[in-house]
Amino acid sequence: MLKATGPLSIILLASTCPSSGAAPLSFAEFNNFARECAPSVAPSTLAAIAQVESRFDPLAVHDNTTGETLHWQNQAQATQVVMDRLEARHSLDVGLMQINSRNFSVLGLTPDGALQPCTSLSVAANLLGSRYAGGNTADDEQLSLRRAISAYNTGDFTHGFANGYVRKVETAAQQLVPPLTARPKDDREKPGSEETWDVWGAYKRRSPEGGAGGSSGPPPPPDEDNRKSEDDDQLLFDLNQGGPQ
C-alpha cells in the first residue's frame, strides 16, 4: 500500500504507455513498463514490491473497508467500480503498486490513472525516491532502501520493519525468477557458469544452517569481484546493486 504524506512532483506517463488489458503482467511486460515509466528505480526492486502488493495485477483493488480483494480483466469496469466505492467513501488500494485512494488528491490521480501500470509505477518510483536518503557505504545505501520501502507501506521509516512488510519484499526479491528461454545451440554447447537473475546481487547471504539468510537490517559488504551492470549508473537505487565497486 502506497503511503504519501505530502505533495509529490510526478510525471504521469499513462498517455504514452498502453494498458495491459489483462492481468497479471508477465515478467517481460512488467520489465518494459518499469524501464519506460520508472527508470530511476531498478525493475527488480519494483518487481519485488509489486509481487507483494498485487502479484503483478494492474487491475487489482483491495477494499480496506470491506476486506475484499477484487480483480478485473476489463479496465473500464474496474474504473467504474472504483469510482462507485469511492463515492461510498470506501478506502481502496488500487492498481499494480496498490496506491491508497486517500492519496489520490495529493498525487493528482484519478481512478483510471491509478489503474494504469505506467502511472502506478511512476508514482511508486517517485515515492521511493523521495524517501531514499542514500548513504556513504553500500550497507548504508541498502538500509536506506529498506527504510524507504518501509515508508512506502506505512508512511514511517520503521513501522514497515515491525509489521513484516520489508521482510516480505526481501523474500519476494529472493524468490522471483524469470521464465527460462531457449538459447541457440552454439551457446548451449559453450562451457562456463550460467548467470542467474539475482535481485540481491552481492548481498545474497546464507544462514549458518545453509538456508537463505537475510534480515531487515543492512547486509554485509559485497565481494570486490562483483561487477556492476551497464544499467547501474542509471538507477537511483537498486536491490541488485552492491554499492561502489
UniProtKB/Swiss-Prot annotation:
Alphabetical keyword list: Crown gall tumor, Plasmid, Signal
- Gene3D superfamilies, sorted: 1.10.530.10
Q: Which organism is it from?
A: Agrobacterium fabrum (strain C58 / ATCC 33970) (Agrobacterium tumefaciens (strain C58))
Q: State the protein's purpose.
A: VirB proteins are suggested to act at the bacterial surface and there play an important role in directing T-DNA transfer to plant cells.
Q: What is this protein called?
A: Protein virB1
From the UniProt entry, list the residue stretches annotated as the region Disordered. Answer: 176-245
Q: Which family does it belong to?
A: Belongs to the virb1 family.
Which stretches are tagged as biased composition: Basic and acidic residues? 183-193
| Biological processes, Gene Ontology terms | protein secretion by the type IV secretion system
InterPro entries recorded for this chain?
Lysozyme-like_dom_sf (IPR023346), Transglycosylase_SLT_dom_1 (IPR008258)
Q: Where is the signal peptide?
A: 1-28
What Pfam families does UniProt report for this protein, alphabetically?
SLT (PF01464)
Q: Which GO terms describe its cellular component?
A: type IV secretion system complex
